[in-house]
Amino acid sequence: MATPAAVNPSEMGTDLPGPVSMPGAVVGAGQVRMTGAMPGRGGKRRSAGMDFDDEDGEGPSKFSRYDDDQIPGDKERYARENHSEIERRRRNKMTQYITELSDMVPTCSALARKPDKLTILRMAVSHMKSMRGTGNTSTDGAYKPSFLTEQELKHLILEAADGFLFVVAAETGRVIYVSDSVTPVLNHPQSEWFGSTLFEQVHPDDVDKLREQLSTSENSMTGRILDLKTGTVKKEGQQSSMRMCMGSRRSFICRMRCGSAPLDHISLNRLSSMRKRYRNGLGPSKEGEAQYSVVHCTGYIKAWPPAGMTIPDEDTEAGQTSKYCLVAIGRLQVTSSPVSMDMNGLSVPTEFLSRHNSDGIITFVDPRCINVIGYQPQDLLGKDILEFCHPEDQSHLRESFQQVVKLKGQVLSVMYRFRMKNREWMLIRTSSFTFQNPYSDEIEYIICTNTNVKQLQQQQQAELEVHQRDGLTAYDLSQVPVSGVSAGVHESGKTIDKTESLFSQERDPRFSDIYTGISTSEKKMMVPSSTSGGQQLYSQGSPFQPGHSGKSFSSSVIHVPGVNDIQSTAGSAGQNLSQISRQINTGQVSWSGNRPPFSGQQIPAQSNKAQSSPFGIGSSHSYQADPSSYSPLSSPATSSPSGNAYSNLANRNTAFDVSGESSQSGGQFQGRPSEVWSQWQSQHHSQQAGDPHPHTQASQTEVFQDMLPMPGDPTQGTTNYNIEDFADLGMFPPFSE
């Protein structure tokens, strides 16, 4: 039984693929020791072959016909060959599928060399996750906040994206949908996009690029492709499977035409829309030509029509039966043009950049220098900037370069005269700072921004004229009545005419009626005052005389809701302020006379009426910048010699502010300001010198109702209005819109 096995070792060796190590040591009769892994013979080998056959879909029946008519060696050889063939076919199929998968995944096809199989599988999984979004969003709307409607969510998304949503047919480019946010972005009404194609809205030179992005055919993807996400050039080949895949990403940049819809200066924040247009545009266009903005479009290819939606009959008859559509968001792309673009659209550059070494030698110049100073960049390279500076300004410029080196990164500005190419002198403002090596902390070079001062001022003036002509800076004053500022010295020393508006812009003709009404109303509210410049408001060392006239009030405080102004006559306001400033500079007390105490006779008579918020009364005797000077009760320097001048009010826990300027905030005065002051002065006009405190009349009670808080009034509480409450108030309160 063991003889055939011992006789055929060579035959068995020839049947085995590859070299077989046979030491030849006989272990037993008919047995030979063989190194290496060798499968057993007989039923084991046949069962292994049958397992591989089952893997290929073939049953063990093909071996049944060899059981009787072939020897066992031939059957084993066929089984080994069949197994190798099956493995080869399986490997070929796997390689084919992985190659297709690699072509479908953009990150794989963008690699320089072919990745291995594990890398392809890993990138495919990542790509599928990115196509699904974050992985936790669902189509049932569970990701949407419950307190937001669909319309509100759409507006929030478009506002955050700062763009507009549009849907176009992939084959024809017909606009299926566009959001209303296209108006603030491209200044196009929504109706202009409906019924048109996207090819009509883009620049003629970008039509082919757009058609390539919308196409899903195989012919459009031959050649090299630039991947915008990775910044690499893909290899040549067909990408039809990716182009036809649902949800395939599209990202491209094109130029879209800007419309001419009227600007809504209320909703578009006035100047921001114009600045955005020029920042994202391609420069000024010629007269009659369309203006284009650079738009970055990102989106996906989707099936069209969606499930459950049918195409209208008119679209079917027109042949617009596209199977795909592009759903994308268009955002304005900031252009990288080095030319500075101002609001008028017709300006030339006013500044250029230059780089210098520590000695002032020019190592780099911005090409904008051609339009600013007339030199070519090569004319300036390698030269000292002092060569172009005026001889009288060279020392000043040299010191500024030495100083900026010591500042180490801080900006230093200097103005000097620069010689242009036409031998003329130009006033240049240079803002410079140093760049330091982050490792060695040494100064590498100096960066300078050089600006033509005169040309910049001219362009700013032209910009302002453009704004006023377009109506972008016209304030709507129909809801805010504003009174004019009386003649006087402003903060910067500039005299402001009484008829001049609070705003620096010129008046718009549309609001002439409003300004006329304001002028009429302020004339009615103004209290005449004829205080001469040489007359002293309060004599030093003399008690306060109650029988004073209107001359004692150099200015009347009139409060308009939202605006507080100080009004006085044109003839005496400047003189009064100059006299006050002289008194302050000499260190004298503004009102050092004996203040008569206010008796409480007239206060209890008013306790049965509701009181309004208090406000300070008196004349404009204290205009000091120090907040402590706004009340004579706040510091010993401004108090009267008699310490108990206001003892009655102090005991009642009610402070009486006698400064005329410390209570001009909007919350301090409610009611009729013109009537209050006219009644207040009429009472003083009717007083006699012998009666320091006349009896309270009906009109007097109405006046004090708006002036003094009553002690014990539940509406006032225990609030004590001291100077700390008005410490943050300036002499000229800011205007709040």
Curated annotation (Swiss-Prot):
Pfam families reported in the protein's UniProt record: HLH, PAS, PAS_11
Keywords in alphabetical order: Activator, DNA-binding, Nucleus, Repeat, Repressor, Transcription, Transcription regulation
Annotated segments matching region Disordered: 1-73, 525-556, 588-721
Top-level taxon of the source organism: Eukaryota
GO biological process, one term: signal transduction
Gene3D superfamilies reported in the protein's UniProt record: Helix-loop-helix DNA-binding domain (4.10.280.10), PAS domain (3.30.450.20)
Tissues expressing the protein: Isoform 1 and isoform 2 are most highly expressed in the brain, eye and skeletal muscle and to a lower degree in liver, heart, kidney and swim bladder. Isoform 3 is most highly expressed in the eye, forebrain, midbrain, hindbrain, skeletal muscle, gills and brain but is barely detectable in liver, heart, kidney and swim bladder. Before the pharyngula period isoform 3 is expressed throughout the entire embryo and during this period extensively in the brain and eye.
Biased composition (Polar residues): 528-543, 588-626, 643-656
Domain PAC: 413-456
Gene Ontology molecular function terms on file: DNA-binding transcription factor activity; DNA-binding transcription factor activity, RNA polymerase II-specific; protein heterodimerization activity; RNA polymerase II cis-regulatory region sequence-specific DNA binding
Protein name as it appears in the record: Aryl hydrocarbon receptor nuclear translocator 2
Organism, as annotated: Danio rerio
Organismal lineage: Eukaryota, Metazoa, Chordata, Craniata, Vertebrata
